[in-house]
Structures are given as C-alpha cells and as structure tokens.
Amino acid sequence: MAKNESKFWHEIKRNTPQITWTRIENSSALGTPDLLGYNTNSNFFTVELKVTKGNKVTFSPHQIAFHMRHPLNTFIMVKHLASRDVKLYEGKVIEELVACGLKLDACRSGLDACCSYLQWLEA
C-alpha cells in the first residue's frame, strides 16, 4: 500500500474497533483487495482502499477483474485528499467508477457512514 493508503487504513482501523480486520499484502494473487473484514453480523467482506488527489480513481486490470468476478460483499473505499471526503462503492460498480470517477454516486459518503455500513452489513 502506498503511504497515503497506509494512513487511510489506520484511520479506518481506529474508527471500526467492532470490525475484525486482516490487512492483505499479497503479491502472488494480483488484484486481491487490501482488507478482509469480519463484522458484528458474522459476515466477511473485502475492501479495496484508494486515495486520490482528483476525481479519477485508478485500478489495475487485476483489481477490476477481481471485482467483476466477485460482485458481492466487495467494496471500494476512496478518500479524496483535498476535501478529505470518504466514499464507499460496491465492487460491482468498478467499471462505472473507472469511467465516472468520484462523480459516481456512492452507496455511502463520509467516514462514519461508510464504517457504520460495513459494521452492520448482512449477507
């Protein structure tokens, strides 16, 4: 993870003590999301972290393929550095996110709303 994504990860971890997180650093399975979460409803989910300076959110072809193959319980959390806004997107909209960037409507906006959504996510 890049330096800004590492800081973002620590911010998420601090704000979600009720979620058990596993940080995934895997160079052999390209495209695997950054985080595996386990919430209070006994559900597993993955989160890809992105930090951006502008409207564009960039992904590797492997990351796009992962989210296309795994459309459920996969998420992308994006932090815009200038505004400090945090948005959560479902993995199944990754192609739209690539095309539209942060103009795409998120399923949740704001760090607290994003974290709360993941905490109470059900199957």
Language-model region placement:
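Structural signal for conserved beta-strand scaffold positions within catalytic alpha/beta enzyme cores
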Residues: 23, 48, 76-78
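Acidic-basic catalytic patches of nuclease active cores, encompassing PD-(D/E)XK
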Residues: 1-26, 40
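Short strand-connecting beta-turns/loops that link adjacent beta-strands
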Residues: 40-42, 81-82
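Beta-rich catalytic cores
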Residues: 31
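Mg2+/Mn2+-dependent nuclease catalytic core
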Residues: 52-70
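Charged phosphate-binding loop/patch that engages nucleotide di/tri-phosphates or the phosphate backbone
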Residues: 101-123
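Nucleic-acid nuclease catalytic cores
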Residues: 68-96
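Conserved catalytic cores of phosphodiester-cleaving nucleases, focusing on short active-site segments
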Residues: 35-37, 43-53
